[in-house]
A protein has these predicted regions:
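Elongated alpha-helical scaffolds
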Residues: 73-76
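Sequence context of c-type cytochrome heme-c attachment sites
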Residues: 3-70, 81-144, 150-173
Length: 173
């Protein structure tokens, strides 16, 4: 349904957040340096789906759920309905299948138009013919703000070391 968005995501760092050899090497180094005391510090941003599924922090990617291996997918942002601020990736993704509501910066006007038009042959009910589609898109203003991304894109280690400052750099540019 969103081929351009999918194509952009599929070659982005978000798509490789959990599978990246650089990430996995860095995480292994941090684990070794801290004797494993960093817990879920890295994976809660690199694998929020796995965290919400209750997967262990230290687990082979081969043993993870296929969706968990996809890194930061659409649902990581579009299934959040609360503003978290800077919580270092501790996000509670609203669970559900394709038919459950999604959240976005614009709300549901376009979705309603697509559903009502009949042109797209979409289906909002399980077991019915047609392309399955979300039943509702609710407005989530925070998704349209740059601060939303700061939840994961400012990384301060427990000793105060600023590992990544992407959001702060953007904010101060």
């Amino acid at each position: 349904c969103h081929p351009d968005h999918y194509r952009e995501w599929s070659v982005s760092p978000h798509a490789y957040a959990q599978l990246s050899p650089v990430f996995n090497s860095m995480q292994a180094t941090v684990l070794a340096i801290t004797n494993g005391t960093n817990g879920d510090f890295c994976v809660r941003c690199h694998n929020p789906v796995g965290m919400n599924l209750g997967e262990p922090e230290f687990m082979s990617n081969m043993d993870r759920h296929p969706t968990s291996r996809e890194g930061v997918t659409c649902i990581v942002c579009h299934r959040l309905n609360r503003a978290y601020g800077k919580l270092s990736g501790r996000l509670a993704i609203v669970e559900g299948d394709l038919f459950e509501p999604v959240y976005g910066p614009k709300g549901g006007d376009e979705l309603e138009r697509v559903i009502e038009s009949g042109e797209y042959r979409v289906n909002t009910e399980r077991g019915k013919a047609g392309r399955a589609i979300h039943t509702k898109a609710e407005k989530f203003f925070q998704l349209s703000t740059s601060g939303f991304c700061g939840t994961c894109h400012d990384v301060n280690l427990v000793n105060g070391f600023r590992l990544e400052e992407a959001f702060s750099e953007f904010k101060n540019s």
